[in-house]
Amino acid sequence: MSKPFKLNSAFKPSGDQPDAIRRLEEGLEDGLAHQTLLGVTGSGKTFTIANVIADLQRPTMVLAPNKTLAAQLYGEMKEFFPENAVEYFVSYYDYYQPEAYVPSSDTFIEKDASVNEHIEQMRLSATKALLERRDVVVVASVSAIYGLGDPDLYLKMMLHLTVGMLIDQRAILRRLAELQYTRNDQAFQRGTFRVRGEVIDIFPAESDDIALRVELFDEEVERLSLFDPLTGQVEATVPRYTIYPKTHYVTPRERILQAMEEIKDELADRRKVLLANNKLLEEQRLSQRTQFDLEMMNELGYCSGIENYSRFLSGRGPGEPPPTLFDYLPADGLLVVDESHVTIPQIGGMYRGDRARKETLVEYGFRLPSALDNRPLKFEEFEALAPQTIYVSATPGNYELEKSGDEVVDQVVRPTGLLDPIIEVRPVATQVDDLLSEIRQRAVINERVLVTTLTKRMAEDLTEYLEEHGERVRYLHSDIDTVERMEIIRDLRLGEFDVLVGINLLREGLDMPEVSLVAILDADKEGFLRSERSLIQTIGRAARNVNGKAILYGDKITPSMAKAIGETERRREKQQKYNEEHGITPQGLNKKVVDILALGQNIAKTKAKGKGKGRSTAKTGIVELDMTPKALQQKIHELEGQMMQHAQNLEFEEAAQIRDQLHQLRELFIAAS
């Protein structure tokens, strides 16, 4: 099923890219465990990584620090590798409230979560791709270090069907029930099956638009065909097919029975400890809750909160790392850590926060001590599991630099010839008035300005002051959700306003070629927001414009400022020298404004199979761009209802047309959530 990686791009590597690609590939072939790609803003880091993947033909996991950047990378990788398996693996919760206990007020908070079905399907698709083929790029968030079902048990549970195989209908239905598929002869949807005489239709859990029809003759599989679950049209017949479990957490019956005995043993030991410490209430609470869970597991094969017993279900010892997405990645896989200066510290912090909450639950009798082993990976476990790694950042952290040693690959020269911004340091005393005159100069020539302050109060006061002086200004703060933030950025690019004021939200991954000036107020106040890395990242926001400039307001030059200015000047000199040697004139980027939000548009085109290309499909792509996630979800439910109604009325063309709209909306929802 695997194909070779085939890179689809109209451009050839240029600038520093060819040298960076060569050095990274040589390092990987020489067996280097850690390398760092120091790539400046706009130098085409993703394109460099895509070239490395295509040349070395190795399955790859790309870790991003948040869902927004993961969605952006997924869209880019999907365009680079349209013929290969580019998958998306992020948390499937739209909303998640973990189980917790607050001793001070004696308050127990039940686990409450809302699962996004489309993202769940994409997660299942990602693990299936890793198990079945080698031409895989999985773009994941830090969700990848959280516990997932054991790949060995997952593989054991799969149902393999081949034409000519002897198996009776009841055996197939029993196996489907074990895989947690449910029978539904009326509404045929993901993770269900229906039976009509000797024909079984199965809608695989990891599939979005293809179902399997199993035709039996007596006790023999006569034909296997793939069909469109909406129209019923047969797409192809296949000699064999593998049905994967409906969830990553499915467990064979014998393993559940064995786990139940181990849980009973642990419960008996824990009860003795609690009674010895005179904790009668905790002992009663724990017994009651655990007995209830055991009863459910015995009857149904699972229970609410079954993940708390994952250590027993996967057969691991106390303290052993949980199975994660890394266990599904082949041994010769490649790991790319994007924006590594943010992602690496995130990975380190996940375990401790989770541990503190669970220890309280164990202490007060809500959970058995084994629940502590349902956790994300510790940092040292992540290090042990990670395959050969490339860290990608414009400002690599100390960890990456230490691990890479001399293997820091510079990618400073941009293919467009754009230079790093000119930096000026100006006094604090006149910073606001000076900024106002700079803004007015930019507004006249239709360019935008980013201003970063140290405090929320100052950002609010500055916004108010600029508004009073007739400037079109908006304020970006932490209370604004991801989608609204994207809309503000889009409006800035479209020229709805000229100035965007923020605190710490104007750093990684913002792509705005229209911004020609970045103003950093109080740049001489040494600290987290004015560290060398923060300054370089913020200055980099003006690096996509031909007239890029950064003004640092400060009365003295701090060590961080000196390092940031020195590094920016080093890069600028190297870029200028390259341009002179090769006769390159810097060109401004001409990136379409809708690109930020329409991350899924091209993806949807590759998924849609040329069906239902009516007017409504084209219209959806534009109209839905500025909808909130809630409105998008509502629209998706509404269209799903319409689609099923058309299918029931045998109006298959209309149903297929709506299905194509749904593809687009779901991709937009991923980008937005």
From Swiss-Prot:
A motif (Beta-hairpin) lies at residues 92-115. One of its GO terms (cellular component) is excinuclease repair complex. It comes from the Bacteria. The keyword ATP-binding applies. Residues 26-183 form the Helicase ATP-binding domain. It holds the Pfam family UVR. Its main location: cytoplasm. SUPFAM superfamilies: C-terminal UvrC-binding domain of UvrB (SSF46600), P-loop containing nucleoside triphosphate hydrolases (SSF52540). The beta-hairpin motif is involved in DNA binding. PANTHER family: UVRABC SYSTEM PROTEIN B (PTHR24029:SF0). Forms a heterotetramer with UvrA during the search for lesions. Interacts with UvrC in an incision complex. Belongs to the UvrB family. This is UvrABC system protein B. The lineage of its organism: Bacteria, Pseudomonadati, Pseudomonadota, Gammaproteobacteria, Enterobacterales.
